[in-house]
Amino acid sequence: MCGIVGVIGNQDATQVLLRGLERLEYRGYDSAGLYVNDQQGHDHLIKRVGRIRVLSEALDETVSGTMGIGHTRWATNGRPTTANAHPHVSNDERFFLVHNGVITNAAALRDAYLQDVDLVSDTDTEVVVQLIAALARTGLTAKVALQQTLGLVEGSYAFALVDRLDPATLYVAKNQSPLLIGLGDHFNVVTSDALAMLDQTDRFVALQDGDLVTLTADTVTIEQLDGTPVVRPAHTVVLNDGDAEKGPYPYYMLKEINEQPAVMRRLVARYTDAAGQIQLPAALMRTLQTADRLYIVAAGTSYHAGLVGAPLFEQLAGVPTEVHLASEFGYHQPLLSAHPVFIFLSQSGETADIRQVLVKVKAQGHPTLTITNVETSTLAREADHFLTLAAGPEIAVASTKAYTAQIALEALVAKALGAAQGRAAAADFDVVHQLSLAASGQQTLIEEADVLHAAARDLFATTRNAFFIGRGVDHAVSLEAALKLKEISYVQAEGFAAGELKHGTIALIEQETPVVAFITDPLTAAHTRSNAEEVAARGAKVFRIAAHDLARPDDQLQLPPIDARLSPLLTIIAGQLMAYYTSLDRGYDVDRPRNLAKSVTVE
């Protein structure tokens, strides 16, 4: 959600911060700001509502410095206004603070310590910076004032603090919100996402909860809140700087849709040997074989990927598998089996709801596996085991390639687990061949983009409502296709189990109501067709997407060959492209839909 950048050292701070903020745009934001200091008595604070370009246009050549902090804000406390934008400044204009997270006791702190202080914003962050300043006025150093403030606040935070009286130092603190230190040559950077600072360095230190960091141009000192020094390892982030660029594509989403065939091939290459045998860490395989039940915990698109993965684990590995929404599981944990293993799916690896569950079940002693696209993420670091999606940066808010990568990796893990346990179903399932079919089939569908654009225009050009139906994994992909359409086109789209239409939803069918029917499950294809005919009889405009061996001449889209259990790897390409073109035709920003953030780092 909110994004933080900071720099101190021999760099042009204004340009470093602006470029970093631009690379954080994909996370979602409604305002932005920066503070820069030249360490020679000149500093500047600029904040604006709107896009980064609005902030950039507000700067002139006088806004320069060798250290500073920047922020993109996603409103959680207070409306999107200039006053509520970060950085926040203390009334004595000594301290400047940026913050990602939520301080849950801000009101209590204000009442207890700041009754005589006039606040100019509605944010929890201003309470923190004013509290630091109030403590400093008692004679405490900036660092000690920050330490004492951290001992008082409750909630989640990633802080970057500048003391105007000591601009050669930058203070950083973290609790339950991601924050990285980037190591440079006579400079250091701070960021909530390595992607924002990859043009500066590829060496990053992932901070842990309770870390307090003092940065200068040449030093990084990490302590716990009680002053105990700690050492955190530095990791090299292997990523081509150009991977985060759109290249020839008008939008990141279209680029990422087109990258999915390559992602399928990359996953096979990463997790299999020359003989086509799946290679997973031995410790992970031992853990998985202890499971009497798997619990997949996820949110949003990742939850939908889990719904596709669950039957793969049950059919190939013979392990009962449940899929849970993280936001529900965190507060309403079901009765667990005797030997559960938890699998967490998250594109960003920073989803707050999922981390809450991870911390909870680890405290209960249960083994955990994170599957994510970001190797430096909190979920990757804190789980017992970690597998990377290797999908490359996903910048568009609407997830595409991470979804299909999650399904593909679930298939690889399910096959490996089933094979290790001698399951005949696993032996009969050639997952490498199926993922090769997925890659070629995805490419075929991508090349039919014009057909899908025309279909999207016919179905969704003026509609306010749309329905996607299917059974089994087709129901799972219906949920995801509906989510894609509603996310970026603002159409009230819903995915339903086709058999449930008659239990209420069919009452919503009117003349020309668009209904997309997925028909890839041989066990239920006839029933889904019957449901499609039923809504057509009531005036619905039906678009049928059918498996190659189940297709009829009047089906509008026939899929390339693939095992039915992996059909979502193909059907969702149609759903993604139709959503993309609907948003495009309606004139919306495909990559940055309203009210949505790419990385949901607060509950």
What is each of the regions a protein language model found here?
Residues 1-246, 250, 262-269, 273-292, ...:
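Conserved short alpha-helical segments that host acidic/polar catalytic motifs at enzyme active sites
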Residues 66, 70-83, 271-286, 309-345, ...:
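Glycine-rich oxoanion-binding loops at beta->alpha junctions
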Residues 67, 95, 293-295, 341, ...:
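Structural motif
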Residues 153-187, 460-487, 522, 529:
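Acidic/histidine-rich
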Residues 180-202, 206, 327-361, 500-534, ...:
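Glycine-rich, anion-gripping cofactor-binding loops and their flanking helix/strand elements
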Residues 260-264, 268-295, 385-514, 586-603:
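Active-site phosphate/pyrophosphate-binding segments
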Residues 289-423, 427-437, 471, 518-560, ...:
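Glycine-rich phosphate-binding loops that contact phosphosugars or nucleotide phosphates
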